[in-house]
Amino acid sequence: MLDLKRIRNNSNEIKESLNNRGEKFDVTVIDEVLKLDEERRNILVKVEVLKSKRNQVSSEVPKLKKEGKDVSNIVAEMKNLSEEIKGFDTTLAKIDEKIQYIMLRIPNIPNPQVPDGDTDEDNIEIRNWSEPTKFDFEPKAHWDIGSNLNILDFERAGKVTGSRFTFYKGLGARLERSLISYFLDTHTEKHGYTEILPPYMVNRTSMIGTGQLPKFEEDAFKISEDDYFLIPTAEVPVTNLYRDEILKGDELPLKHVAYSACFRSEAGSAGRDTRGLVRQHQFNKVELVKFTKPEQSYEELEKLTNDAETVLKELGIPYRVVRICKGDLGFTAALKYDLEVWMPSYNRYVEISSCSNFEDFQARRANIRYKEDAKAKPQYVHTLNGSGVAIGRTVAAILENYQNEDGSVTIPEVLRPYMGGKEAIK
């Protein structure tokens, strides 16, 4: 959520930033917010005048009573003033509700580093690692490799649940589990993150706090009876871990890593990468989340992105890093990098991680602040997160990049200790 004071003082600048964001955002709502804000402030002035008058009149009552004078008119006036104040309070509550409704639907302001552009084709490659994998045979897609090796079963998952679900079997299940352990071990032992195992369901307030709601409710799986939501990413519970709290400045940055299952309806994605493991309704992911001071956040974003890159390098999977343009930035991020791995069957790079700085956008929604010391004024933290990385897509990338002509798949060396010393899946 944006700072209302910032909108008040820089409305034209904010309109321009949102106009260029590529989401076809209706900037006239900024004028609506300003109008409501002005109305609210005018009413607050009137309320203060009325309260001052009521206090003044009220202070005269004891003196007049002591003098034996009739105070019925003054008491009646006090009652009228109180009723008038109560009416204004009701009006203020309605205005606040309208302002909140609009503010929750205004996207974040892009950082000046974000390139112009409308679609993912306008994203800018920052760097790449290793050349795309070449084969002297016709490579297969990961869904065929997995099915042939009997380690992925899409057909039976479709029978048991529906489309875009998967059974991992045998060494496929072990590969998935090995990646989870390897990612968690790397980020905790080498990169200094504290591991969190979060709930897989959160309440509506948590989804609002990280920006999934109200805009993306159709993409979420909801438990209707309790108004709980299955998490689309561990970002939601881990960020909300400190909702409505004031952190200590000397504890920042806080760095957490969390493994979780993730659940997404992927509404509107029909026909887009829906075969195989790339776009599932349920998938596993290891998430990196940071809470920082404002002046630390962009340096910490670079570190977080490098942490995610480390596991891809150690796995030996070719990848690139792209800076996301304004039109592809999404609702909550101020600046975002995507890590994309090479997928031979697609003959292109496929996103495996998004690393974002939200600045104070989520912190304002979730009311997460910090104080430098006991006497300091609380300030909003900056929140960051990134996949470290998506497990299913990593399995897909390993199957495709490490496939052999005989149909087997070589296991990356870094995973072999987790795979019982096995060198290949046959």
From Swiss-Prot:
It is an enzyme of class 6 (ligase). Pathway: Aminoacyl-tRNA biosynthesis; selenocysteinyl-tRNA(Sec) biosynthesis; L-seryl-tRNA(Sec) from L-serine and tRNA(Sec): step 1/1. GO terms for biological process: selenocysteine biosynthetic process; seryl-tRNA aminoacylation. InterPro entries: aa-tRNA-synt_IIb, aa-tRNA-synth_II, aa-tRNA-synth_II/BPL/LPL, Ser-tRNA-ligase_type_1, Ser-tRNA-synth_1_N, SerRS_1_N_sf, SerRS_core, tRNA-bd_arm. L-serine binds at residues 233-235, 287, 387. Pfam families: Seryl_tRNA_N, tRNA-synt_2b. Consists of two distinct domains, a catalytic core and a N-terminal extension that is involved in tRNA binding. This is Serine--tRNA ligase.
